[in-house]
Amino acid sequence: MFQLGSLVVLCGLLIGTSESLLGDVANAVNNLDILNSPSEAVAQNLNLDVGSLQQATTWPSAKDSILETLNKVELGNSNGFTPLNGLLLRVNKFRVLDLQAGLSSNGKDIDLKLPLVFEISFSLPVIGPTLDVAVSLDLLNSVSVQTNAQTGLPGVTLGKCSGNTDKISISLLGRRLPFVNRILDGVSGLLTGAVSILLQNILCPVLQYLLSTMSGSAIQGLLSNVLTGQLAVPL
């Protein structure tokens, strides 16, 4: 009888603790901010080689350079967890599958879409490094060409970079103790938005820096090809 009573008390404590942890995780997720700006520091910190991209004058060569550079980027510390906006994560696997282009809804700009796949480990509040997820996500960014009034040369203008949360897919890798599983199931919905923001914070500054180094003629050529139907890639 004593054992049964102790078990009831223990279950009550676990339920209360899990509710508290869910609240802690929710607070961490809600406090995430989106960082979205290209910076010279991005290239310096990641040791990006943009020489071939700067020399590219056609879209095919620029696309190849962007994909090659992105797929070589070391995202965080592969041997440990990287702090990011109150959460800790480690990117175990990462790949950009493609770089697709299409005409934007205004008929003047180019919309770029990058399908991404990740395997990520999260360290959640109190629980520790217990959550491994596989993620597929589309990263979106618009670009346009504007003529420099002083030089008369075309220049690249960047739109907002964002993750397409309508297309995000998250799968939990492996299961653990029932107590931990309950917490993971409870936060899986929260993680959809959190993962999108975290990946935007990691990749958007990198992508925008790469796009900012492109020649205007490469984007102008891409826009001309899309407008004339020579390049029609559905987004």
UniProtKB/Swiss-Prot annotation:
Q: Which domain of life is it from?
A: Eukaryota
Keyword annotations from UniProtKB, A to Z = Antibiotic, Antimicrobial, Disulfide bond, Secreted, Signal
Q: Which InterPro entries match?
A: Bactericidal_perm-incr_a/b_dom, BPI_fold-antibacterial, Lipid-bd_serum_glycop_N
A GO molecular-function descriptor: lipopolysaccharide binding
What are the cysteine partners in each disulfide bond? C161-C204
Please list the tissues where expression of this protein has been recorded.
Expressed in parotid, submandibular and sublingual glands.
Task: Provide the Gene Ontology terms for cellular component.
Answer: extracellular region; extracellular space; secretory granule
Provide the protein's localization.
Secreted
Matching entries from Pfam families are given as: LBP_BPI_CETP
| Principal subcellular localization | secreted
Q: Show which residues constitute the signal peptide.
A: 1-20
| One GO process term, biological-process aspect | defense response to bacterium
PANTHER family listed in its UniProt record: BPI FOLD-CONTAINING FAMILY A MEMBER 2 (PTHR47145:SF1)
User: What family classification does the UniProt entry report for this protein?
Assistant: Belongs to the BPI/LBP/Plunc superfamily. Plunc family.
According to its UniProt entry, what is the function of this protein? Has strong antibacterial activity against P.aeruginosa.
What is this protein identified as?
A: BPI fold-containing family A member 2
Name its species.
Rattus norvegicus
Q: What is the lineage of its organism?
A: Eukaryota, Metazoa, Chordata, Craniata, Vertebrata
Q: Which gene encodes it?
A: Bpifa2
